[in-house]
């Protein structure tokens, strides 16, 4: 997997974006060819797929966590399927809380706290494991563009600040697919980190299935200290904004590529930077799980999803997925 930072031209078009357009056309053709040749399988349970149209953090993990808690409260059995980004996984594996991020991916380790998790790089490999676990629902994280399985219910996550970037496909832009088709097909659309009342124009046709959501801190952190922040996630700017909105004094920050696997040298450099700033290190849960026993002096900001209209979510999911039939 190529690990990239989110370049500026992905948000605002410049000469680099236009120079890369020819490669984007190849990406588009290969995606069309893949979808045309695919023969989607029916997984042995109803599928809720959570995904996005673009590269970078849009709050998918928090949506999956929210769904897991919702289903657990209703006594609905479920399994979460995740892609195991950044792991050395060779085949589909059932994840437990003893797995490390290198073995299961950072998201797999985090999600294992909420229920049964299968980490895989090939969706077809999960079938035997699903047959063993026999869930009512499969929550699939980040396989929206995968044409090889049937989806009963789809949720598209959109970051309210980045939206769809410059509107170009990878690598000229951040898009995995053009949004209109995905938004039309979606059962629900989450506009994440939306603190404004105005809905972006591109989403106004979908207001009847739009949920405004915020990612908010879920643990208490000492606000009297100075903090040096770092992260290797898809949308680090949102993490830093969350820290500041929480009232923490951030004296500096460092950004790593998404799903970055930290080395001992990185950790030593971070401690040195924190010392220079007379600060304590603070990071995300996705980064924190990668340090194992070395993270005792690193503060972790836990976050969760807060939504403004949970009734719409409940109605659409439990009605269309027919969980209680």
Curated annotation (Swiss-Prot):
It comes from Rickettsia massiliae (strain Mtu5). Belongs to the LpxK family. This is Tetraacyldisaccharide 4'-kinase. It catalyses: a lipid A disaccharide + ATP = a lipid IVA + ADP + H(+). Its EC number is 2.7.1.130. ATP binds at residues 54-61. HAMAP family: LpxK. GO terms for biological process: lipid A biosynthetic process; lipopolysaccharide core region biosynthetic process.
